[in-house]
């Protein structure tokens, strides 16, 4: 999904729901322009996608993977009720895999 900041009339990010690398789970991922950071817009958009995935799409859980060093992303995922499932080394850095359950 493309995320638009309505008040500013511009696209500011993307949220995606698709298969995770593990082949078992669906993953929510997101990217936002730095100008959109700190306004709660990513949280709002990811929350909508998670809600739809768990209700309308009928998924029993959704995961998200982010670098442990990305504290803002970790904080966002925790604020949505996601919990740390495990840590893995990937892409040359430690990643945390979060889950809705």
Short names for language-model regions:
Residues 1-101:
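Acyl-donor (CoA/ACP) binding surface of acyl/acetyltransferases
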């Amino acid at each position: 999904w493309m995320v638009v900041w309505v008040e500013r009339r511009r696209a500011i990010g993307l949220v995606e729901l698709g298969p995770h690398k593990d082949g078992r789970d669906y993953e929510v991922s997101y990217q936002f322009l730095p100008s959109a950071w700190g306004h709660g817009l990513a949280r709002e958009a990811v929350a909508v996608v998670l809600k739809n995935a768990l209700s309308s799409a009928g998924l029993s859980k959704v995961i998200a993977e982010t670098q442990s060093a990305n504290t803002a992303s970790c904080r966002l995922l925790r604020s949505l009720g996601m919990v740390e499932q495990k840590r893995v080394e990937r892409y040359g850095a430690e990643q945390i895999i979060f889950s809705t359950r």
